[in-house]
């Protein structure tokens, strides 16, 4: 779990912040999405993504590392079997934060943090590879033309 930063915290103490983030992560994995304040969602995201990465590895050591944070065995089982399986093709970006209207009562900025369950589109990967190939080809084309010109001048 990330060490709380110096300065203002989400709660009164570092221990309370760790417990609060652990509870929010448990709720996120249990329900798939939670509504909270924007600062809490931004602090929860790196923790949740790290836990999903550990769950994708799937061995006993990483299960024990996750159990340090999430103490509910049924949620850990769901994380390792269902959620990690859904995220197998995804290389990161397992969560999404969506801003919503401010909370009634204190007008605190609210947000929904949810797990991204849509499958990764292979089309995006192919497009990125094609763009990279065209950039490489474009960079090599002037070099090849310059080499041909110097070869002709040498003859």
UniProtKB/Swiss-Prot annotation:
One of its GO terms (biological process) is translation. GO terms for molecular function: structural constituent of ribosome. Keywords: Ribonucleoprotein, Ribosomal protein. One of its GO terms (cellular component) is cytosolic large ribosomal subunit. PROSITE patterns: RIBOSOMAL_L17. It holds the Pfam family Ribosomal_L17. Belongs to the bacterial ribosomal protein bL17 family. Part of the 50S ribosomal subunit. Contacts protein L32. This is Large ribosomal subunit protein bL17. It comes from Bifidobacterium adolescentis (strain ATCC 15703 / DSM 20083 / NCTC 11814 / E194a). The gene is rplQ.
């Amino acid at each position: 779990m990330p060490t709380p930063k110096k300065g203002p915290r989400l709660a009164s103490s570092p221990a309370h912040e760790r417990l609060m983030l652990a509870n929010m992560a448990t709720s996120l994995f249990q329900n798939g999405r939670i509504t909270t304040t924007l600062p809490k969602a931004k602090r929860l995201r790196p923790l949740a993504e790290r836990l999903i990465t550990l769950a994708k590895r799937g061995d006993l050591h990483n299960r024990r590392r996750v159990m340090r944070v999430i103490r509910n065995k049924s949620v850990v089982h769901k994380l390792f079997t269902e959620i990690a399986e859904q995220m197998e093709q995804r290389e990161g970006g397992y969560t999404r934060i969506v801003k919503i209207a401010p909370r009634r009562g204190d007008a605190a900025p609210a947000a929904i943090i949810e797990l991204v369950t849509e499958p990764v589109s292979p089309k995006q990967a192919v497009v990125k590879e094609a763009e990279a190939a065209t950039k490489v080809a474009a960079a090599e084309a002037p070099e090849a033309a310059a080499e041909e010109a110097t070869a002709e001048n040498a003859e």
